[in-house]
């Protein structure tokens, strides 16, 4: 649809503020017609260019000769219409001439073939050596994946041999492992189990903790306990943030205090001629220290 531009309406103003809209007149009618004609030419040119590109890039397209003389005449009319449609464009003059010459040569060969031997039309090559061969041959397009599969393809006999060899090796290895496992089980059954007394376990733990400098309490539960205790002493609007090194220092101090307290409580238990540490020993140790309330 052609669009036509219009000028702004003529307004007649009065003293009371009212206005009358005058006649709306088109601007430059001749120039608008020229623009519309140019737009139509450009649109037609783009369509022809697109159709030509589609025909030129169709690699699998074959030439199919007409079966009867009526079909040949209809094809000639379509070709002439296509060529006449391209006469308006100066860009495709050379392409038009080459296409026209090729089509004329094909038509002449077809006519000569019909006159000479109409029954052998399938065996005649209507396209000459100078024209481009647009026929599709599957041998020209090899599949790289198929080549890779063919390189790595093995016979079923070889694969079965490999499976048998691998399975026999695994079976022999499994038999050897089974014999070793049976020997170990027999040795364990014949050996008497060593029984450790509670004092041996205590001595082992004492040596273990004396040689290490690691913390005895895990860090995450201790940090949770510290935050719960501090929440009881702050207001609702306050919010404290703890550094990791501060919590680590508190944990070191608390563990040192507990170790010293338990040492004193253990001495009090030995003074009472006992080995087992009791609650009253810890309470007495705190009272002697002056920390009992």
UniProtKB/Swiss-Prot annotation:
Residues 132-141 have a biased composition (Acidic residues). Residues 150-164 have a biased composition (Basic and acidic residues). Residues 132-169 are annotated as: Disordered. Residues 157-291 are annotated as: H3-like. Keywords: Centromere, Chromosome, DNA-binding, Nucleosome core, Nucleus, Ubl conjugation. SUPFAM superfamilies: Histone-fold (SSF47113). GO terms for molecular function: DNA binding; protein heterodimerization activity; structural constituent of chromatin. Its main location: nucleus. GO terms for cellular component: chromosome, centromeric region; nucleosome; nucleus. Ubiquitinated. Is degraded through ubiquitin-mediated proteolysis when not protected by its association to the kinetochore. Transmembrane segments: none annotated. Component of centromeric nucleosomes, where DNA is wrapped around a histone octamer core. The octamer contains two molecules each of H2A, H2B, CSE4/CENPA and H4 assembled in one CSE4-H4 heterotetramer and two H2A-H2B heterodimers. Interacts with the inner kinetochore. Histone H3-like nucleosomal protein that is specifically found in centromeric nucleosomes. Replaces conventional H3 in the nucleosome core of centromeric chromatin that serves as an assembly site for the inner kinetochore. Required for recruitment and assembly of kinetochore proteins, mitotic progression and chromosome segregation. May serve as an epigenetic mark that propagates centromere identity through replication and cell division. Belongs to the histone H3 family. This is Histone H3-like centromeric protein CSE4. It comes from Monosporozyma servazzii. The lineage of its organism: Eukaryota, Fungi, Dikarya, Ascomycota, Saccharomycotina. The gene is CSE4.
